[in-house]
Amino acid sequence: MELRSQEVRTLAPENDPLKMGMGWKVDDLSKPQILVESTFGDSHPGSAHLDQFVREAVQAVNENGGKAARYFATDMCDGIAQGHDGINYSLPHRDAIVNLVEAQANASVYDGGVFIASCDKSVPAMLMSIGRLKDMSAIVVTGGVMEAHTLPKEYVVNDPACAINELLTLEQIGKFDAWEKTGVIPNSQLDYYKHNACPSCGACSFMGTASTMQIMAEALGLMLPGTALMPATAPELKQAAYDAGKQLMELVKKGITAKDIVTKKSFENAIMVHAAISGSTNATMHLPAVAHEFGIEIDADTFDRMHRGAHYLLNIRPSGDWPAQYFYYAGGVPRVMEEIKSMLHLDVMTVTGKTLGENLEELKKNGFYEHCDAILAEKTAGFARPVSREDIIHSFDNAKGTDGSIAILKGNLAPEGCVIKHTACPKNMFEATLRAKPYDSEEECISAVLHGEVKPGDAIFIRYEGPRGSGMPEMFYTGEAICADPKLASSVALITDGRFSGASRGPVIGHVSPEAAVGGPIALVEPDDLIQIDVHNRKLAIVGVKGEPKTPEEMDAILAERRANWKPKAPKYTKGLLKLYSQHAVSPMKGAYME
C-alpha cells in the first residue's frame, strides 16, 4: 500500500510539526491520511445536520487504521436564494465548491476521502470533486431527506394534482403563495404552510435535484447500497456514515480508487435509474459535468437516447403522490435497480469492493427489503388503506410509463437542444402550436402571469438567463404561478435558456441552447411568433410569425434577417464569481461547467 501522504512528509519538514500542533500523535503521522469533506454549515436544512455524520465517519476512520481530517465547503440553498439575485449564484457555486475541495485535497495530500453532502449543488459538487481527484479512494455519504408534515384537517386542500393531500412538502409552497396572491387562500393559511413545510433537517422531501443527485451518487457505485435518500432523522443514517468511513479504509488498503469504480457503464446505469425515478432535469447538466471530471464524455443527448423506452416506476412528488421519505421505506435505490436489473450493467465495481450484481444479491439475502417493508408498515399504520411498496415504487411490469421521463428537443429554436420533463407535463401539451410572448427577465414574466396578461395558448419565453447570461438561475416561481392557475396549467408553455427547480411541473422547457447571451435563436423570438412543441418527435421550432405559418425555408430567411439586426447585451457581471462563471461556462447540454 503506497501512500501519497507519506511521500510528501519527506519533502517538507514542517509537515509533521504542523499536524502535531493540531493534537496529532506521532503514530498518527504514518497512518493513511483521510480527508472528511462536508458541506456542513448553518446555510439550510440539508447541511445543518451534517456534523453528526462527519463525527461518525471520522470515528470510523480513526478506529480502522487511518487518521481523519475534517474540511468544510458550506453550500448555499436554492430555496433561500429564490426571488432575488442570490439565485444567480446557485449553479456557479457548484463549481466554486469543486475548486475549493480540489485545493484542500491537493494542498495537504490525502490518501482517501469521505465526501458528505445532501443537496442540489453540493452532491454534484462532491461527485465532480471525486472525479477531479479520481486517483484517490473515495466514498460518498448523503444527508438524507426531511420528513413531510401531516396537515390538520382544516388545512388540507383538495389539489387534483396530488392524491395524498394530507402530507405537506416544500415544493407546494410556491403554488400556495400564488394562491394567496390571487385570493384563493388567506394569508394566515399560507403562513401555516410556510411554518410547517420543513419539519426536520435533510433534503427537501420531493424528487427534486437534491433527492435525484443523492440517488445518482449511489447509482454510480460511490455509496454503500441502500443508503441514498434515507430519512435524515433515521438512526440508520448515522450508522451508514460510520460504515462508510470504515469501508473507505478498506478501499485505501486495497488500492481501489474512484477511477476504478466510476466508468462509462456506471454513468449509463445512473441514467437508467434517472429514467426510472423521473429525476430532475438538472441531472442532465450535473451528470455530464461529473463525467467530464472523470474524463468520460456524456451529454444531454445520452439521456434522451437512454430514456426512450425506459420504464418509469416512481410515484414520488412532484411527478407522483408521495413525499420522498417514502422512497427509502419502499426499498430505495436497490429496489429500483432490482426492478430494472435487465437494463443495467451488473458487472460494474462499487465501493463495497464487489460488483453491482453481487450487491443486489447480498441485499436480498440479508433481509434489507423485509426491513424496509416493516418500516413502511409502521409509518403508514394510520392511513385509510394499507400501503405497499408497489404504491411508491411500481414494478417493472406495472410501470407508470414506458418512455422514461426526460426528452431532449431540438429544432431551429434550440439547435443544440433543450430539456423537458415530460412525465410532469400535461399530455395535451405534447403536441402544441402556441403564440410567443418573450420576456428578457423572470421578474417581467412573473408579473405578467400574476396580472392576467398571459393567456391560454401563449408560449412564454424567459431569456438571457443561461450560464453566460446570468449564471443560469431557476425559473421556479413563474412555473408555479402558471401551474397554480387552472386556466393556464395545461394551456401555456414556459420556455427558457435558464433552468428549473427539480420541483417544477407542467409544460416547462429549459436549458435552451445556444442561449440568448451568445446569440442563440431564443434571442430572436418576437411576440406572436408561432412556436411548435412536439415531444414525441423531439422538436421545438419557430414555425410562423405574427400568427401566420411559414415554411421552413421562409423561417430560415426570417431568422437570418433578425440575426443580422441582433446586438448582444453588455455583460451583466463585471467582477467576482459570476463574472468568472459567465465568461467560462460551457453549454448546459455539456454540463454547464467552467472550462
Predicted segments, located by residue:
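Catalytic or ion-coupling anion/metal-binding cores of large enzyme and transporter domains
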Residues: 1-46, 53-73, 79, 85-90, ...
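A short, small-residue-rich loop immediately preceding and capping a beta-strand
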Residues: 105-126, 138-142
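Well-ordered mid-protein domain cores that form the structural environment of catalytic cofactors
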Residues: 90-94, 98
